[in-house]
Amino acid sequence: MSIYKTIGVTPIINAKGPATRLSGGLMRPEVAEAMVQASQHCVDMAELQAAASQQIAGATGAEAGYVASGASACLLLAAAACMAGLDPGRMARLPDTRGMKNEIIMIRSQRNFYDHAIRAAGATIIEVGLPDRYSGAGVRDAEGWEIEDAISERTAAIFYVADAAAQPPLPVVTAIAKRHKLPVIVDAAAQLPPQSNLKRFIAEGADLVAFSGGKLLGGPQASGILCGRKD
């Protein structure tokens, strides 16, 4: 009997793909075995995260990496890092961001349920662009000049949701950010496969990239990796 049936839950046929609300993707057997082995020992979590950071950096081409409880948690941590930096006092005050740069620019057509993670960290999302392309009223989306025009002394970062149809292209956004010395956070939760995307977003200039561990990476559902700059 299925373990789910013992608690009255009915297994389903998932024809959509690794969606979080449908319990993500199926975990690889070797991952399950590794979790069983790991569960038999205690380790220093700081040492484990440092070792994981090296593994993630090697796979993504980033300077460092971090394991969190999902891509959404990674986005919250990324937003928090962009606002508080390495200041422990500011870290302790979050989500109270008074006195900090706390605005994060986001393309209006990329808004979604998961950007709540950005707001949960204490950030205010500043929307730019017109989603004409999705309403059928035109072909216009956000343009580079609109992102640049929204930058102010309160801007902490630019948030970009990776998608095949995303406009403007990520390199355009990262070029704008670099001119203004701002970090770019990329939500790439569902952008695997292809495997090349593990390194693509860092190569295109992103500073922090979040991937889901519970989709096609084949890890546990409540997992995610954040990769990017050490600082």
What positions do the PLM features span?
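Conserved PLP-enzyme active-site core in the AAT-like
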Residues: 1-22, 26, 53-67, 72-231
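A glycine-/small-polar-enriched, mobile loop at the entrance of the PLP active site in fold-type I
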Residues: 13-51
